[in-house]
Swiss-Prot record:
GO terms for molecular function: structural constituent of nuclear pore. It is found in: Nucleus, Nuclear pore complex. The keyword Nucleus applies. PANTHER family: NUCLEOPORIN NUP188, NUCLEOPORIN NUP188 HOMOLOG. Part of the nuclear pore complex (NPC). This is Nucleoporin Nup188. GO terms for cellular component: nuclear pore inner ring. Disruption phenotype: Lethal at the pupal stage with stronger phenotype with temperature increase. Impairs sensory dendrite tiling on the larval body. In escapers flies, leads to decreased negative geotaxis and seizures. Belongs to the Nup188 family.
């Protein structure tokens, strides 16, 4: 707020919390300075406020100077109301508007616009002015009271001020003020009725005047303690008090109003006690002259005052003063007059009056004022006893024992009382002892009071050995012998108490004394008080029936009740059972008997019953089980049925749980409500809370019934009950609210495993309070408002100490409960957005309907000056509301932005405000940033140029206040941080950093743009990162998070942040940071249940560091690159710490974070990051330690830890492959750990799958199953990596660990279990991938022993929901996302088929039977898979089609055996292959259809509707390549059933019956429809032309790579190097594509598509297609069964359609085609001279020759046969075994697999790469099965003049020549 210029008066309200000591946080120097500045004003008190006529300054003149003439009417009326001189009136108005007023500027204009609104504002200012005057008096009283109290924080400052003013000056000044206030009259216009609401304002003025008089009286009373009053002061005080009859004369106060009655009573008591204090001389002999003068001056006045009750104490004190201070006791007449004064005092019930004064609320605390009052009364009682109680007569005065009990219940008087012998008030106690047990009630009450005051042990020891027992004389029982007058001796022993073991022995002396009730014998024999109490209880139990319900007047009941109250205090004093004496046991046990006896009475004595229950409550800490059992058996307390009903709503509604309130409910309704006192209810609540605090976990028996009773029958209705005392009502509210707090706090305690009842209790409590019945009562307390709370506190005498059960305490408890309810709402309502009834009331919208206005009311508590906790609770409650309220908090506050800033922000820069409130405000700002943008904007608004508040509203010179914007406060924080980074350790800077963190977290950085634009911003903010690192600071986490967010969201141009990051990664900074982050405690972090999201700072810092590194790695090198040395250092330390943390897995969180960090670090390395073999060895040792530790406790690992560790191992496997291969010992340890992990995962998976099946959860998709699947998938990836590495380069026995644990069998078994489960689809795919990897390697032989067919063949059948009656494999039947669909089954089935193919390819006939079995089972589905291309060509569908056709192509190698096994399946599948080939060929011409099939069903309609030209994209090109693969496989399969081309060409005899014709011959172009499509010559020739065109458009060139090597050749020197030979070849390419010749562009795919297809695939497909065409063409031409017409058609088609192929060969293959037109002329590569040798010898002696094997498949036969028959000698070749690579297609003309490449000039990737030779076979018998050896030829070796090498182009030239010849010959 704007600061007001130096004023003529002080802002006292602001000064009070600063100097009073309530907050205990104001600096002492500030307190001294502020008080010294106003010392003169403090001395003047209320006289500093001058009346209107005290100054000649006119108000109009003043306002004219201030340029505020428009406020003149308003200010004039205010001056008339306050009766203040002009300058002070103006200052009061300014203070109110700048400090107190909470409305907006626009509202202020409205308030001064009309008379009605003006009157309301006048009243508010008048109240503010009244408070200002009262604060002055309160500060002065504080100074006097505490300036000599060492434990007050400012007592030295107070003493200095008091010494400056001096006590005498204060005394004289406040005497003047007392006289002035008593004589003061109201303002003239108020008395004349010329103001609005004059009558009400006159009453308000009178109330203020009376309160100020009372406060001045208290100040004088305290001053009298420090400086006794002299004669003149006493006379002035007496005269002033007498002037208005000791407060009775009040003109404008109504005696019929309770509040006015209380004001008058307070004045009367205060004035009376001030006079009594003045007359209290403890040593009268020292003040004899003063006493004589007082008696002389005041005797007449005082002696005449005997008409009112308040005169009684004055007469008593005056009598005692005369008797003690003069010689009146020696003069008979004077003594008689004194006795008359005493008699009048007794008749006026002076002791009753003194008791009322001592119990009054003004003196009901332990303040100095109360002590002075009680000491004064105590002294008077002592003087009276010293003078008149020699015979015990004082005990007969009415109310004297009640007064004494009240006085000695305070420690300072109780200690004095117990330290005296027989003088003073102790004589009253001696009288009680002499007459015991006649006055048992008074003795019990006195003992209780002394026990409460801390003298319990003294009292108990006294009462356990009382000296005298008084018994009514019974002639029949008491045998006495007279020894003197009234003195007797007991002749026979007497048992005074029946059924009690206590006997008075013979010989005991006694005295006979006559009492009003008869003659009593007082035996001088020790007696125990508790025996007498026991006797009284026995008598009461016997007399119960004779009382006839008249319990109120029963003396016996009063005795027992008082005795039990003392017994309760005595039991509480006992720390254990041993502290309870034997005599105390019976009275305690008989409490239960009393409860049992009186519970059945119609109107029981509730006071007695409450005392009994209180005794049981006191016994609970000692013997709780017995007490609980006995009380439960009485059935007097509420109960519920003992069944296990854990539905909290039933309990909350008391519906269906057997709830009964029992005796407690009836006694409240029938007795206590009528008496308007609720003692038994309070006792029950005390018993309930005491038992609950024992935490015996009996909530169903005790706490839940009690809570239901309180929240159903008491709390919501308590405000309608009548009470004799408001204090008792507040006490019940306090106890109930405290009990609720105890229950809600249970949620924050450590949760036990068997605490369902405790959770039920909390839920019942929360649910009940969230409902309207109880919630509305709670909101009524919260919604009281600061104005009323502060007003009630203003009326209190002691502002330094609140009433224990006052309104302010109830408001605080209610706000605390409300916070807990909002926090725990999710426990009963779940995570739903539904508002509870209580929340609906709080968040009522629109605001016009919000009558409670809870949120604005809570906000109002921010300005409370009496309770330091209310503003803090207000902020915390608003914070909770801001976090949970899903609507605008700004709308509910109903405040403008400047009002919000005034309410909250002004406290932040104020050095006089406590840190606690500042922290609460900053937490509120933090919460609003997260959820409340409107309030956040108000907090962060920094442009105040147009803000009316920032201007001087009254033209006063104002300085801008920093508190108006939190941004400025944050700027100061940054400046302080730059100066001293360690400032961040303090609480306030830490909260500011939290706000920065929240802003970045919620992307609200723009709110502090002005700060961020500063070039030094990042340097200042991040300065703590480069200072000395402090342990357990959350700000490091926040800073790292802020940097991470800025780096992630930024564009990389933040130079200032880049400088900070570069500095961070410097060695001097980064090294200590690594040490700090990786320095973690070994003990598990304790979870804080009070805040579910709270984590230890070191864990948060580690996580933030990990996030920062991960983000920087993602952003590098765009933003910053971590230096290589620091990065390696981080990697090394991270691994070391990770391995170390693996030994402390009780808390998995740090291990998980470290493991994930190391994963991301490793991902940045492409190669090993170690620099030496030693480092590499060390790293591998650490990795093996980690793996061993993981294996040791793998089942206990958290899933994230498993996944991260598996990723680490997998990545390290790739990085350190060489080491694993090189060091067999490391490899063995590594493999054993891998085996252990995978076995654990497989076992876990098998168990989980079995559990799912047993529970029928086949469609379960729980998070647990997902997590377990992820870790297993990572294990499988690790297994793939290991298999790949060791298969290629590992030792021969690397698979021994896998074989030893039967891993392959377990994998097969596991996949068989997961295949049918939809929830394990991904896992099934991964398992099959692993099986495929192993099947490709050396371990494939293990699958022959795994019963693969038994486990998998049936499991690979489609799931049941996909099987339809027609087995339509391509139609979806499970549309539900949680069930199988065909699209989800395709990848699984495709991998299953691929696995079968690979195993078959590796083992041929060993696996042939199993393969045929698979085909037999799956024939229908394989056929559907082959036909799937008509439905979909999505990636998974394409994969399935390729897998199916590859399997069929492979198995056709043994088509004869297949036909024998199942000719039907063979026929159906080959028919499907032909159909697939037809449909595939058509797709090249139907690109839109192809696009639809690729897009899937969801997007097909959009593609079909589109009228735009189809764009050839990567997807389409890739699909055509896949279709080419499919075509190759289809042709391979068909070639098995087509005649061998070489046989057709070379065999002398042709047998047409052995072969069938596969291609149909039809006229015309191929049909484009898909119905009844048959494979024709036209389709195949069309495909040939498509691929020729593709090769042509790609300018395909041949590199002339030899496909064979020449044996038995003497190489010349020039040809020794094969590379030289190849390098001399001509590499021919053409820059211009050939014409299409016979293929029109309309019958061929788009040129763009063809030109981008894979050239190698096109060539491979062309080779296969050419062989099929040639074979079938010759077969047809030579067939005797076909007509000549059809043969002619074939010749014509070949002649016409293959013209483009022939042209392609002529241009690209034939040597010098332009000059040499002969198609038979070919190049001769590797021309060498022949050396005829013995083939057998050459095969064994030549070390350079390679061996050629003829495998069972015929893919390679054409080229090999051609070469063998025409150019090469037949030789036996034995190729080495190799991996079967499904990605490589075998060309029908490919070289032998063992042939090595001899050139590096081949620019294109070959699909049949050469493999390295030299690998050994797995087993000899398998090698024998796989290879068929041909015997050496018997004919002599073929010999020519020269031999040449065969190249790829030779095949094309041969086929071209063949097709050129074919049309012209038969």
């Amino acid at each position: 707020m704007p600061a007001v210029e130096k004023s003529v008066i002080t802002d006292w309200k602001r000064l009070w919390p600063m100097v009073s000591g309530i907050h205990y946080e104001t600096p002492q120097d500030t307190v001294r300075e502020e008080l010294m500045n106003v010392a003169s004003e403090l001395q003047a008190g209320v006289l500093q406020f001058k009346p209107k006529n005290a100054s000649s300054l006119e108000l109009g003149t003043l306002l004219k100077e201030k340029k505020q003439e428009k406020l003149l009417p308003f200010t004039e009326r205010l001056q008339d109301l306050l009766d203040l001189e002009s300058a002070q009136c103006w200052e009061i108005l300014c203070y109110y508007l700048t400090q107190e007023y909470r409305g907006s500027a626009s509202l202020l204009t409205q308030l001064i616009s009309t008379e009605t609104n003006m009157a309301k504002l006048h009243e508010d200012i008048r109240h503010y002015y009244s408070l200002e005057r009262m604060v002055v008096l309160k500060i002065v009283k504080n100074l006097i009271v505490f300036h000599q109290v060492p434990n007050h924080p400012y007592h030295r400052e107070y003493r200095a001020v008091v010494e400056k003013i001096t006590i005498p000056r204060l005394r004289d000044s406040y005497l003047d003020q007392l006289e002035s206030l008593i004589c003061e009259v109201p303002p003239r216009k108020l008395m004349a009725g010329e103001c609005f609401h004059s009558a009400e304002r006159l009453v308000a003025w009178s109330e203020r005047n009376a309160r100020e008089i009372n406060e001045v009286l208290h100040i004088l009373l305290v001053l009298a303690e420090h400086l006794p009053m002299g004669l003149e002061q006493i006379k002035r005080i007496f005269a002033a008090c007498k002037q208005h009859s000791f407060g009775k004369m009040q003109s404008y106060l109504d005696d019929s109003q309770p509040y006015h009655q209380e004001i008058i009573r307070s004045l009367s008591y205060s004035e009376l006690m001030l006079v009594l204090k003045c007359l209290d001389f403890e040593k009268p002999e020292k003040h004899s002259d003063l006493i004589e003068k007082l008696i002389e001056d005041l005797q007449v006045d005082i002696a005449s005052m005997y008409h009112r009750p308040e005169h009684g104490p004055l007469l008593l004190a005056w009598m005692l003063l005369r008797l003690r201070g003069t010689n009146d006791a020696d003069d008979a007449s004077s003594l008689l007059r004194c006795r008359q004064l005493g008699k009048r005092a007794v008749d006026l019930k002076c002791f009753v009056q003194l008791h009322l004064i001592a119990r009054h609320s003004m003196y009901a605390d332990d303040s100095m004022l109360s002590r002075i009052v009680r000491r004064t009364i105590y002294n008077q009682v002592g003087y009276l006893c010293d003078l008149f109680d020699g015979d015990g007569s004082c005990a007969r005065y009415e109310g004297i024992y009640e007064l004494l009990c009240e006085l000695v219940s305070w420690p300072h008087l109780a200690k004095d009382f117990c330290s005296r012998e027989d003088d003073g008030p102790c004589s009253l106690y001696k009288t009680l002892l002499e007459n015991f047990p006649l006055e048992l009630t008074h003795l019990s009450k006195l003992a209780l009071s002394l026990t409460k005051a801390g003298q319990g042990n003294y009292v108990k020891s006294q009462l356990e050995a009382l000296p005298i027992l008084a018994l009514r004389y019974d002639e029949s029982q008491h045998k006495l012998r007279e020894v003197d007058t009234n003195e007797f001796e007991l002749l026979a022993s007497v048992q005074p108490f029946q059924q009690i073991d206590f006997t008075i022995p013979a010989g005991t002396s006694c005295t006979a004394i006559q009492h009003p009730s008869g003659c009593f014998m007082h035996f001088r024999f020790p007696v125990n008080y508790f025996d007498a109490l026991h006797h009284e209880i026995n008598c009461l139990l016997r007399e119960t029936g004779h009382l006839h319900g008249d319990f109120e007047s029963s003396e016996r009941i009063r005795n027992v009740e008082a005795g039990l109250r003392f017994l309760e205090s005595a039991v509480k004093l006992s720390q254990s059972i041993s502290g309870i004496s034997a005599e105390m046991v019976h009275p305690t046990e008989m409490c239960v008997d009393l409860l049992h006896t009186f519970k059945s009475v119609q109107y029981p004595p509730v006071g007695l019953l409450s005392s009994c229950l209180n005794v049981c409550t006191a016994l609970l800490p000692l013997v709780d089980e017995e007490i609980f059992s006995r009380i439960s058996n009485l059935h007097i307390l509420p109960t519920v049925s003992p069944g296990s009903h854990y539905d909290f709503k039933m309990y909350a509604n008391a519906n269906g749980v057997g709830f009964e309130s029992r005796f407690l409910g009836s006694v409240i309704d029938n007795v206590e409500k009528k008496r308007e006192r609720y003692e038994f209810l309070l006792s029950y609540i005390g018993f309930l809370r005491a038992y609950s605090n024992l935490k015996r976990n009996r909530q169903i028996q005790m706490e839940i019934p009690g809570l239901i009773f309180l929240l159903k029958d008491v709390f919501p209705h308590l405000h309608t009950w009548h009470f004799s005392s408001q204090v008792e009502r507040n006490k019940i509210y306090f106890e109930i609210l405290s009990f609720i707090c105890d229950i809600l706090d249970l949620f924050n305690t450590a949760k036990e495993s068997n605490c369902k009842q405790r959770e039920l209790l909390v839920k019942v409590c929360v649910y009940s309070l969230l409902n309207l019945e109880n919630g509305l009562i709670l909101l009524r307390f919260v919604g009281v408002g600061n104005a009323y709370v502060q007003y009630t506190m203003e009326l209190e005498t002691n502002w330094m100490q609140q009433q224990p059960h006052g309104l302010m305490m109830l408001v605080r408890l209610s706000m605390r409960i409300l916070m807990q309810l909002l926090r725990l709402k999710e426990e009963v309502y779940g995570n739903s957005e539904t508002l509870s009834p209580l929340e609906a009331l709080i968040y009522t919208q629109p605001k016009q309907r919000d009558t409670l206005r809870i949120i604005p009311t809570v906000c109002s508590y921010m300005s409370n000056i009496f309770d330091r906790w209310l503003p803090i609770l207000s902020c915390r409650l608003l914070k909770r509301i801001a976090l949970q309220f899903n609507m605008s908090l700004l709308a509910c506050l109903d405040m403008e932005a400047d009002q919000i800033r005034l309410t909250f922000m002004q406290k932040l820069p104020d050095e006089l405000e406590s840190d606690s409130i500042k922290i609460a405000i900053l937490e509120l700002v933090d919460a609003c940033i997260a959820k409340q943008p409107g309030v956040t904007e108000a907090f962060f608004k920094v442009n105040y140029a147009l803000d009316k508040r920032s201007r001087s509203f009254f033209s006063k010179d104002c300085v801008p206040n920093i508190g108006e914007s939190i941004v400025t406060y944050m700027r100061d924080f940054l400046d302080a941080l730059q100066v001293d980074p360690l400032t961040i350790q303090q609480a306030l800077p830490a909260k500011i950093m939290t706000i920065f963190h929240s802003m970045w977290k919620h992307n609200l950085q723009m709110l502090v743009d002005d700060l961020v634009k500063d070039k030094q911003f990042w340097k200042k903010l991040c300065s703590p990162l480069f200072s000395e690192l402090q342990p357990n600071l959350r700000i490091y986490t926040q800073l790292l998070n802020i940097i991470s967010i800025e780096v992630y969201t930024g564009n990389g141009n933040n130079a200032a942040l880049l400088d900070v990051m570069n500095k961070f990664f410097e060695q001097k900074n980064f090294g200590p940071w690594l040490n700090y982050v990786f320095n973690m405690p070994k003990v598990p972090a304790v979870k804080n249940l009070s805040s579910s999201d709270h984590l230890p700072d070191w864990i948060c810092c580690l996580q933030a560091f990990k996030d920062l590194i991960v983000i920087l790695l993602k952003k590098q090198p765009k933003f910053v690159t971590i230096p290589e040395s620091q990065f390696k250092l981080m990697a090394q330390k991270c691994l070391v710490v990770l391995v170390d943390r693996s030994n402390y897995l009780e808390d998995m969180r740090p291990f998980i974070i470290l493991a994930e960090l190391y994963v991301f670090i490793l991902l940045e390395f492409k190669h090993a990051y170690t620099d030496s073999l030693e480092e590499e060895q060390t790293l591998m040792d650490l990795l093996l330690q980690l793996m061993n530790r993981i294996c040791a406790c793998y089942e206990d690992q958290h899933v994230r830890a498993k996944e991260a560790c598996l990723a680490i191992v997998t990545k390290c496997t790739h990085l350190y492959t060489d080491l694993l291969i090189r060091d067999s010992s490391i490899a063995l340890r590594f493999l054993n750990s891998v085996v252990g992990i995978i076995c654990s995962e497989l076992q876990h998976m098998e168990n989980s799958v079995s559990l799912e099946k047993s529970q029928g959860l086949n469609n379960s998709d729980s998070s647990d199953s997902k997590t377990s699947t992820n870790s297993l998938i990572l294990c499988l990836n690790l297994l793939k990596a290991v298999a790949t590495i060791f298969h290629n380069d590992g030792p021969g026995n690397w698979d021994l660990p896998f074989v030893s644990v039967r891993l392959f069998q377990r994998l097969v078994r596991c996949v068989s279990r997961t295949l049918p489960l939809f929830s394990k689809q991904v896992l099934s795919v991964q398992l099959l991938d692993v099986l495929i990897v192993f099947a490709k390697g050396h371990c494939s032989v293990e699958f022959l022993h795994c019963d693969v067919g038994e486990y998998l063949w049936l499991k690979l059948l489609p799931p049941r929901e996909l099987l339809q009656s027609k087995h339509e494999f391509t139609k979806t039947t499970a549309a539900d996302a949680e069930g199988w669909t065909v699209e989800q089954w395709w990848p699984v089935y495709a991998r299953g088929i691929e696995l079968v193919t690979i195993i078959y390819e590796k083992h041929k006939k060993c696996f042939l039977e199993d393969a045929f079995q698979f085909v037999g089972i799956h024939a229908v589905f394989l056929e559907d898979a082959l036909l799937l291309s008509k439905q979909s060509l999505e990636p998974s569908a394409m994969y399935l089609i390729k897998a199916a056709v590859n399997l069929v192509a492979s198995l056709t190698e043994h088509h004869k055996e297949w036909k024998q096994d199942s000719d039907l399946s063979l026929a159906n599948l080959m028919r499907a292959v032909q159909s697939l080939l037809c449909h595939t060929s058509s797709l090249f011409h139907q690109q839109k259809n192809l696009k639809c099939l690729l897009a899937g069903r969801r997007s097909q309609l959009e593609i079909l509707r589109s009228t735009e030209a189809l764009i050839v994209d990567d997807e389409l090109i890739s699909a055509c390549n896949d279709l080419t693969d499919i075509i190759i496989s289809c042709v391979k399969a068909l070639l098995r059933f087509s005649p061998d081309l070489m046989e057709l060409l070379c065999c002398s005899a042709y047998e047409p019956s052995k072969h069938s014709i596969l291609l149909d011959v039809k006229f015309g172009a191929p049909k484009l429809n898909e119905e009844n499509l048959t494979l024709t010559f036209g389709i195949v020739l069309n495909l040939v032309n498509i691929y020729v065109k593709a090769l042509n458009m790609q300018n395909h060139g041949f590199s002339e790579v030899p496909l064979n090597s020449l044996p038995n050749v003497e190489h010349s020197g020039d040809n020794d190097d094969p590379e030289v030979c190849v390098g001399n070849q001509t590499n021919r390419t053409f820059s211009k594509p050939l014409s299409n010749v016979s293929i029109s562009t309309g019958t061929c795919p788009a040129s763009e598509l063809l030109s981008n297809m894979d050239g190698q695939l096109c060539l491979l497909a062309l080779e296969h297609l050419l062989m099929l065409v040639a074979s079938q063409a010759i077969c047809i031409i030579r067939s005797p069964n076909l007509e000549t017409l059809w043969k002619q058609i074939v010749r014509r088609d070949i002649s016409n359609e293959l013209l483009i192929f022939n042209e392609f060969v002529r241009r690209k293959v034939i040597l010098d085609y332009k000059e040499n037109r002969s198609p038979w002329l070919r190049r001769k590569h590797g021309l060498c001279k022949l050396k005829c040798v013995d083939p057998v010898r050459s095969s064994s002696s030549s070390s350079r020759s390679s061996e050629i094997v003829r495998r069972s498949n015929t893919n390679n036969e054409l080229r090999v046969n051609v070469v063998r028959r025409l150019h090469l000698q037949q030789q036996q070749r034995t190729p080495p075994p190799q991996n079967f690579d499904m990605s490589s297609d075998l060309s029908p003309i490919a070289a032998a697999q063992g042939a090595a490449m001899t050139t590096s000039l081949d620019g294109r990737k070959r699909l049949y790469p050469a493999q390295q030779a030299g690998d050994a076979f797995l087993e000899d018998e398998l090698a024998a099965i796989e290879l068929q050896y041909f015997p050496p030829p018997t004919e002599p070796g073929y010999c020519e003049l020269s031999q040449v090498q065969v190249v790829e182009e030779d095949y094309l030239q041969l086929m071209s020549a063949l097709f050129n010849v074919m049309p012209h010959c038969d």
